Design a protein with these regions (language model features):
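A short, aromatic/hydrophobic, helix- or strand-capping loop or linear motif
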Residues: 35, 79-82, 123-129
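Charged, gly/pro-rich active-site loop segments
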Residues: 8-11, 90-155
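A generic structural signal for short beta-strands and their flanking turns/coil linkers
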Residues: 27, 42, 51-53, 71-75, ...
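Extreme N-terminal tail/first-helix region
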Residues: 2-29
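Structured helix-beta-strand junction loops
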Residues: 25-26, 71-72, 117, 127
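A short mixed-secondary-structure module that forms the rim of ligand-binding clefts
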Residues: 47-85
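A short, Trp-centered hydrophobic/proline-enriched beta-strand micro-motif
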Residues: 21-36, 75-79
Length: 155
């Protein structure tokens, strides 16, 4: 994995660990999709794979969100650790994960991963009217201290 910071590539091990920590600590993300060139955002409960290549979330199939994602598979997701106070200007980290999304089978491994983070969402996940979605991350753009921006290519 290569990390691009200010036009230069560097080792991604430290940044990857910071990203893993954020992904494990945060329970919610803002999912952005679009329809007819209009953006649409939602909060979703998510879980990421250990290698950070995939982000999983659940949505009812009868929603606008599901319809938009199945017609245009390109989405992005923002995960952050802001606390809504002035310390955020120096301490907050925000991550944008971009890629393509698909509905996937509710396999034992993915269910275990998702419910390990969100055990209170078992009924929602297991409902026949819910779809398990997988975002295959193309890249992460990581912003910290509002000016330090790093890009992590996952391909």
């Amino acid at each position: 994995m290569r990390v691009k910071a200010g036009g230069f590539y560097m080792s991604g091990s430290d940044m990857k660990e910071r990203l893993k920590s954020l992904m494990n600590e945060q329970k919610l993300a803002v999912l952005a999709s679009s329809h007819k060139d209009e953006p649409y955002t939602n909060l979703v409960a998510f879980a990421s794979s250990d290698d950070l290549k995939y982000i999983f979330f659940v949505t009812p199939v009868s929603t606008r969100k599901y319809s938009y994602m199945t017609s245009s598979r390109k989405v992005s997701m923002m995960i952050d650790n802001r606390s809504n106070n002035e310390n955020d200007f120096k301490d907050a980290m925000a991550v944008n994960a971009s890629g393509s999304v698909n509905e996937v089978e509710k396999t034992d491994a993915i269910v275990k991963l998702y419910l390990g983070k969100h055990p209170y969402l078992r009924d929602f996940l297991e409902s026949p009217s819910s779809a398990l979605m997988r975002l295959e991350v193309k890249n992460y753009i990581i912003a910290s201290r509002f000016q330090n921006v790093v890009e992590m290519d996952m391909k």
